[in-house]
Amino acid sequence: MNATGTPVAPESCQQLAAGGHSRLIVLHYNHSGRLAGRGGPEDGGLGALRGLSVAASCLVVLENLLVLAAITSHMRSRRWVYYCLVNITLSDLLTGAAYLANVLLSGARTFRLAPAQWFLREGLLFTALAASTFSLLFTAGERFATMVRPVAESGATKTSRVYGFIGLCWLLAALLGMLPLLGWNCLCAFDRCSSLLPLYSKRYILFCLVIFAGVLATIMGLYGAIFRLVQASGQKAPRPAARRKARRLLKTVLMILLAFLVCWGPLFGLLLADVFGSNLWAQEYLRGMDWILALAVLNSAVNPIIYSFRSREVCRAVLSFLCCGCLRLGMRGPGDCLARAVEAHSGASTTDSSLRPRDSFRGSRSLSFRMREPLSSISSVRSI
């Protein structure tokens, strides 16, 4: 049907689709009920919600830029943890940038986009969210494998494997996000279209939901196993310091699981209801979709706090980066700022130097296994 509610001839819809005309987006939005109460496609007022969305996306971008700059410039360690942190930060940075572009191209600008541009706008956000989720899955898998299989592995082999899995994460995320652009959509098949994302097929959304639900369930299962391993290690530890370390790890795992449930649960529930619900239901909860999507994107702002600032090494890197920036600008902050920066540099050098004897142990037959096992099982997990 068209904007006035009269049916649209299939041949005219196909002609619009073949020509990539923006009028096709108006037809799909009108059929799904998204134009109800808007005053027409030229009504672009989003008000305070749009401002909050822009602020949230800018927060995600700036926060991840800060962590990325600090990690790459002030962390000397190049273990697998380093590459996982960089990968998670990059994916969260892309999530914030994609969400910002999505918000700025929404409203009245939506109806000036060609269908391919609309698919690119939404697909980029799907790709970024998928890359962030797959990166968290890879990190959880590496962390679990390091705990249950503390076997010596050459640095080159480990690095190649990490690079391979990171590349696979991004390849799968890009493929998942661009499937509608490649043809899995519902152009001119209005009965198969989503109500919340009018050009997306309900089957495609259900496919994404199954994948994301499987990934998140796997992540929670891995962290549940890590929780039990760390709890068992803490109970067996005879020293108070080891027990405190185990409790710190337990708190980190609980924070990760809670962040996933709070940030991702509402979005999955909304999309699942969209697949099996009606257009009337979608119209009623349309405004809630914007808030729920913003909540999911805010998970990319929570990730640097959980994964980075719970690590003393990354905390030192961020503090050193900020203090060095202030000193370059000639700003003298609190008296302990310079002292903390010096401490951060000395701590990083100490960490770096402590890794060198570990390499020499690899050449020693008598100390080859027992000296590395505790470092692989506990301290590598603690560093995220």
UniProtKB/Swiss-Prot annotation:
Spans within the Extracellular topological domain: 1-50, 106-117, 183-206, 274-288
Lipidation positions, renumbered (S-palmitoyl cysteine): 323
Topology Cytoplasmic: residue spans: 72-84, 139-161, 228-252, 310-384
Bilayer topology annotation: Multi-pass membrane protein
Main location: membrane
Molecular function via GO: G protein-coupled receptor activity; lipid binding; sphingosine-1-phosphate receptor activity
Tissue: Specifically expressed in fetal and adult lymphoid and hematopoietic tissue as well as in lung. Considerable level of expression in adult and fetal spleen as well as adult peripheral leukocytes and lung. Lower expression in adult thymus, lymph node, bone marrow, and appendix as well as in fetal liver, thymus, and lung.
One BP term from GO: adenylate cyclase-activating G protein-coupled receptor signaling pathway
Alphabetical list of InterPro entries matching this protein: EDG6_rcpt, GPCR_Rhodpsn, GPCR_Rhodpsn_7TM, S1P_rcpt
Positions of transmembrane segments: 51-71, 85-105, 118-138, 162-182, 207-227, 253-273, 289-309
Record keyword Translocase present: no
Function: Receptor for the lysosphingolipid sphingosine 1-phosphate (S1P). S1P is a bioactive lysophospholipid that elicits diverse physiological effect on most types of cells and tissues. May be involved in cell migration processes that are specific for lymphocytes.
Family listed: Belongs to the G-protein coupled receptor 1 family.
Protein's UniProt name: Sphingosine 1-phosphate receptor 4
Species for this entry: Homo sapiens (Human)
Organism lineage: Eukaryota, Metazoa, Chordata, Craniata, Vertebrata
